[in-house]
Each structure stands twice: as structure tokens, then as C-alpha cells.
Amino acid sequence: MSSTKVLVADANSTDGTREIVLGFRDRLNVSVIPGGMPSVGRNLGAAHAESTYVLFLDADIELAHPSVVRRAVELAQRKQLHCVTTNILCRDGNWIDKLFYAGNDFFQYLSRLHHPFATGMFMLFNLKRFRQLRGFHEQVAFAEDYLLSQQVERKRFGIVRGGVFTTNRRFQKMGHLRVGWLFLKTAMNYWNPNYFLRDHKYWQT
């Protein structure tokens, strides 16, 4: 990992993120860059990339298995994929949280039959294809990962087993019904770019 460039996009956080990240410089080739909303921060990170693939990770996730990154890259290389994602797991949530994430995983597998979607929590992208698609739409504040990944051809999309652990923070803030309704509306509006440009109050709760 010492030769792998790691970029952390920090949107002026006040929780010591920058200091914590830079504390790993003796083990990792890590830098902190200016961030913003998820689309902006991810695009800024990708602009520094020089490798064949770029991996986008949310800061609050944890890999469920240490080999998931390696296997995602191997899958992308073996099948010449443009985008690879993985399953979402909720280790500390209740059964409803886990049920919702299991439903998300089910629809993610199902999406390969129509328009693929990858979670931004873990999204490995072929850098050349990412730039051809012009990256994440920076005027989109919600489901920017869905909007980008659905442009990937079905045969160029893959899901690697292993998963990432996330929290139930979003469910606690918004409630299961609202999160579920937003998910369904997004899936039903995959064809409507104006839907993604609306303010869904996702980051205001």
C-alpha cells in the first residue's frame, strides 16, 4: 500500500480529520485535498489520479474483508469492467437497518439486467471511462453515484463479494420510510436528469 496514492477530500471539517489522516504518512502515500459536496470531492481526487483505476470510498465505511479491494481490481482486469462495487453491510444496526441494506444489495444485483447502479461508498472505476463520462455531476447533491454508474454498460459492470460496513446514521436522521421512498423515487426516475438536480434535502437532516 505504500506505493498506492491515497487522497482524502476534506470539506473544512472541524473534527481533526486532516491531522488524523496526515498521521498515517509514515505508512501510506496519503495527502489531504480540498473537498466539498461528495461529487466535488470525488472529482477533485480523480483529477490527481494517474493509475488505470480509481477507487472511491466514503470516509465512514470499513472494509468487511481485507481482500475486497484486491479482488475488485482483479475482477475489473479479468472481465475488462468499467465499474465495480460491493455489498453494503450494517454491523451495528437493528434488523430493520439490515433488512433495508439487504434490499439495496438485492436491487443492485437486479440492476445489472437494466441500468447498473453502484454505491458511492465503494466504487472502483476505470479512470479512462470515468473521464469519458465526465465524472460525477457536480450540480447533483443526491444519488450522484447512481446517476454516474447507470451510464456504465451492463457487461462492463461488476459486483465483488466481501462488502463494506457502514452505520445506520442515515436511517436515524431521516427515518426508514423516507430513505426507502427516496430510493424508490430515484430508481423510478433513472431516465429523468431533472430529478437529480432537485433539492431533496438529503444533507439537511
Question: Residues of each region from the PLM?
Answer:
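A conserved acidic beta->alpha catalytic loop
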Residues: 10-18, 61-62
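Conserved donor NDP-sugar-binding/catalytic core segment of glycosyltransferases
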Residues: 66-96
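Short aromatic/hydrophobic "clamp" motif used to bind/position activated sugar donors
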Residues: 54
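Acidic donor-binding loop at a coil-to-helix junction in glycosyltransferase catalytic cores
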Residues: 142-148
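A recurrent flexible, glycine/aromatic-enriched loop bordering the glycosyltransferase active site
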Residues: 83, 88-95, 106-125
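Glycine-rich, basic loop-to-helix element that forms the pyrophosphate-binding segment
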Residues: 33-49
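Short beta-strand/loop segment that forms part of the nucleotide-sugar
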Residues: 3-12, 33-35
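Hydrophobic helical membrane-anchoring modules
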Residues: 153-205
